[in-house]
Amino acid sequence: MIFIDNRQNKFDVTEELTTKLEEVISFVLKEEKVKEDCEVSLVFVDNEEIRGINNETRGIDKATDVLSFPMIDYPEDKVYKDVYLEHEFDKCYFDGDELILGDIVLSLERTKEQSIEFNHSFEREACYLVTHSVLHLLGYDHMEEEEKARMRGREEELLGKLNITRES
């Protein structure tokens, strides 16, 4: 299940946008071979709120585009499909029958700024950032160059399969 919580008032959150982002989340989970029913929360905020969360959780006092809060730990250089395809999770990882993957916090204000900066649509930027964040929930990272190349390649591959291009 995908929970969407709009905690900002600078942008209208349309049903079209939420439906598209739900489709992106579901598609990425399927492509990454997540078989369990899952729970992902997607929270929309503005730059001020994401700056506060970023400072509180990471000690970085500036706004960012998206933050990911995975509930599952991953061994170094491993992602969900490398480790957990046949894994039996403890019941503490579930809400009812759904595996809790984690939370995504997305600044719609920063999303809009970046869509202008990168000269593509707001929807394309939101889809990219949500794809990026779901991959973080599944263990992908970009701290090292090799990890970054793997993650960026996977992002582009997934967005391509969804026909979400930089021209979108």
Swiss-Prot record:
GO annotation (BP), single: rRNA processing
Pfam families, sorted: YbeY
Cofactor: Zn(2+)
Subcellular location as annotated: Cytoplasm
Bound cofactor: record note: Binds 1 zinc ion.
Keywords from the named record: Cytoplasm, Endonuclease, Hydrolase, Metal-binding, Nuclease, Ribosome biogenesis, rRNA processing, Zinc
GTP-binding keyword on record: no
InterPro entries, alphabetized: MetalPrtase_cat_dom_sf_prd, YbeY, YbeY_CS
SUPFAM superfamilies per UniProt: Metalloproteases ('zincins'), catalytic domain
Top-rank EC class of the record's enzyme: hydrolase
Cellular component, GO annotation: cytoplasm
Enzyme Commission number(s) of this protein: 3.1.-.-
Gene Ontology MF term list: metalloendopeptidase activity; RNA endonuclease activity; zinc ion binding
Top-rank taxon: Bacteria
PROSITE patterns documented for this protein: UPF0054
UniProt family annotation: Belongs to the endoribonuclease YbeY family.
NCBIfam families hit by this protein: rRNA maturation RNase YbeY
Function per UniProt: Single strand-specific metallo-endoribonuclease involved in late-stage 70S ribosome quality control and in maturation of the 3' terminus of the 16S rRNA.
Official protein name in the record: Endoribonuclease YbeY
Source organism of this protein record: Clostridium perfringens (strain 13 / Type A)
Gene: ybeY
